[in-house]
Amino acid sequence: MLNVFGVSASMPDDSRSQKMGLLGAISYIVGNIVGSGIFITPTSIIENVNSVGLSLAIWILAAFISMLGSFCYVELGTSIRLSGGDFAYLCFMKWYPVAFAFMCIGCTINYPATLAVQAQTFAEYVFRGAGVELDETSEFWAKKLLGFSLIILLMFMNFFSLKTFVQRFSILASLAKIAATLLIIITGFYYLIFKHWKQNLEEPFKGSNWNPGPFVNALFAGLFSYDGWDILNFGAEEIENPKRTMPLSIIIGMTCIGVIYVAVNVAYSIVLSPTEMIASNAVAIDFANKTLGAAAFVVPVMVAILLIGSLNSTMFSASRYLQAVSRQGHIPSAISGIAPNCDSPRVALLVHILIAIAVSFLGDPDKLINYVAFAQWSQRAFTMSALLYLRIRGRPRHPDRIQLPIIMPILFFLVCTSMVVISIIDDFKSSAVGLGILLGGLIIFIIFVWDRALPSSHTFRNATHVINEESTKFMQIIFNVVPERVGDEEMKNAIGGAESESEKVPAYKISPTGNGQFKCTRM
């Protein structure tokens, strides 16, 4: 039977000399956030708000919301020392039905849709950069196949954890990210200062659309580009003097990112009119074609490289999330399998890729971003309610925590809730996908996981146990992996309790018999 288990709370206790200082924490935040979003969402934002001025205001507002969220999640992460983010905190609160429902959204929408958006954008930049022109149907399938080919290639690379290659490529992707953003900013401001291209900035708020629905959709798109602001939440104990370093690094890091994003969008707006941006499928390419002449090919090449890096990062995070969910007993333990020779969650990788390929057919990148944003911010509203519950009721938390003025989590909770409610009222079709999966997750939990429903049946427990063990053995043979599971007692570590070792689900040793077959022995 699939049970609800606790999550791992292990964090390395590094020496002071190995810990991250202020500069390291700032670079960690900036490096994790600045990426593909700035080349994906500008068109969506200006399409929703219809003006340069309001689109820039959206970028600034998204930076402030992300900064506020980052502070709140730092308090949460230092109060409850669990890996696994929102899902782990909801489990800690014993809100298992809610945690399970949002886990379903995370596995089927959040990560897969993000991967699909990045793959589709990669294909768009490659096709536009290469000047390939096909009829509409052929172009649709050609772009899909190119995106799928890339993520399948990256999947096999992650199967064998080619760390040396991945690390080197990550450096290349980081350089491409820096070069592309600097090139766009410098070029745009060159045309403003020396060529006097000011026409698009003269009436920045002309024609602005202030309707709540489009405004929230634009804000969702902006926040998608700032995604990753909770990164320090996963490594509070890795930071030197966290009570000083973490707040300063958030303020400085998020301010730097906000300045970079606004500068890039000002550069776009100097060169391209709102009409041109709305009509663009690859805004950086149209920018380059209008300003760089024969050197315009450099931009799509750099964007394609950084998108590959972003795809690999998303795939890495998503597969570990799926594997962690399996370790906790929410989904079959076969998915928790880790390759013993390279620590790769191969089954989780494959499952994630298959879901991402299916999700990519749900709509264009803008539609997928709305699905992701609604699901994410719904979950964050529940997570903030958990933090407020802990604060107001005075429940046990880790003694060495960072505690904010309570007005900050209250304000962030209101922001999350407001965006979700407005999205439901004004764009119910986009919200319906997330709401449907959320409701489906609750129904599945009540029927198949809740111990007063089917799991109370001895026959059901035996059947699910047999299916779980047989599927685990099958996946071990196919992928050469060993499944894992964590124990409930590890929850004690979350608030500074005693440590306990991870338990493992039944594992099997696979050995050849010499006649072309294999023997499976329970360990």
Swiss-Prot record:
Membrane side Extracellular: residue ranges: 41-51, 108-145, 195-214, 271-290, 370-404, 451-523
GO cellular component, one term: apical plasma membrane
Keywords: Amino-acid transport, Cell membrane, Glycoprotein, Membrane, Transmembrane, Transmembrane helix, Transport
Expression across tissues: Expressed at the apical cell membrane of intestinal cells.
Annotated localization: Apical cell membrane
One GO BP annotation of this record: amino acid transmembrane transport
Cytoplasmic side: 1-19, 73-86, 167-173, 236-249, 312-348, 426-429
Glycan-linked positions: N289, N462
Membrane topology, record value: Multi-pass membrane protein
GO MF annotation terms: L-amino acid transmembrane transporter activity; PDZ domain binding
Protein name: Amino acid transporter protein 6
Source organism superkingdom: Eukaryota
Subunit field text: Interacts (via PDZ-binding motif) with nfrl-1 (via PDZ 2 domain); the interaction with nrfl-1 is required to sequester aat-6 to the apical cell membrane of intestinal cells.
Main location: membrane
InterPro entries, A to Z: AA/rel_permease1 (IPR002293), AminoAcid_Transporter (IPR050598)
Name of a matching Pfam family: AA_permease_2
Keyword Nuclease: no
Described purpose of this protein according to its UniProt entry: Amino acid transporter that mediates the uptake of the L-enantiomers of various amino acids, including L-glutamate. May play a role in promoting fertility.
Family note: Belongs to the amino acid-polyamine-organocation (APC) superfamily.
Sequence motif: PDZ-binding motif, positions: 521-523
TM helices/strands, residue ranges: 20-40, 52-72, 87-107, 146-166, 174-194, 215-235, 250-270, 291-311, 349-369, 405-425, 430-450
Entry annotated with the keyword Cell membrane: yes
Encoding gene, per UniProt annotation: aat-6
